[in-house]
């Protein structure tokens, strides 16, 4: 089974799926960052502007980390994938992201999802290290899907301002 097939299987199993290539011209939204689309039922979380900017920057780094992890997995560089996951997404990344300073501004549910994301990233790191020994990437991909589920859950429930 190819890496791509395994990735699609893991993403589909995690509920994320793949709808084909994403193109910017297919995603012209009728909303601005300050005016959410009608019917946006996500809970608005108001952060002081410096905290909002820090949180957005942190989430963008999380997304870059996921891309780097996926790239590392595609090259069978499981140790690098594990290292990226733990240092930038895992429980040991909390201090670097300033989690203790941001958490008081988050609703409890958002805090819980964030904590789960960091925990599942640490679990993924262990699965990626195990893959380097056994050369079976499937458990690592499944664990990565669980990490991404936390991101999807948080972005589906909350919006920042």
Question: Which sequence ranges carry the predicted segments?
Answer:
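N-terminal secretory signal peptides that target proteins for export/translocation
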Residues: 1-3
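Bacterial N-terminal signal peptides
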Residues: 5-17
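Sec/Tat signal peptide C-region and signal peptidase I cleavage site
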Residues: 20-24
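Sequence context surrounding c-type heme c attachment/ligation sites in exported
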Residues: 25-75, 79-161
């Amino acid at each position: 089974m190819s890496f791509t097939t395994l990735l699609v299987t893991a993403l589909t199993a995690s509920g994320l799926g793949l709808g084909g290539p994403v193109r910017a011209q297919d995603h012209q939204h009728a909303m601005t960052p300050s005016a959410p689309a009608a019917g946006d039922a996500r809970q608005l979380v108001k952060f002081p502007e410096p905290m909002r900017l820090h949180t957005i920057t942190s989430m963008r780094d999380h997304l870059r980390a996921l891309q780097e992890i996926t790239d590392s997995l595609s090259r069978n560089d499981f140790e690098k994938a594990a290292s990226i996951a733990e240092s930038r997404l895992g429980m040991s990344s909390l201090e670097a992201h300033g989690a203790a300073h941001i958490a008081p501004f988050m609703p409890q549910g958002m805090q819980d999802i964030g904590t789960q994301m960091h925990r599942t990233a640490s679990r993924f790191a262990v699965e990626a290290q195990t893959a380097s020994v056994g050369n079976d990437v499937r458990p690592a991909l499944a664990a990565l899907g669980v990490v991404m589920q936390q991101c999807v859950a948080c972005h589906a429930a909350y919006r920042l301002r």
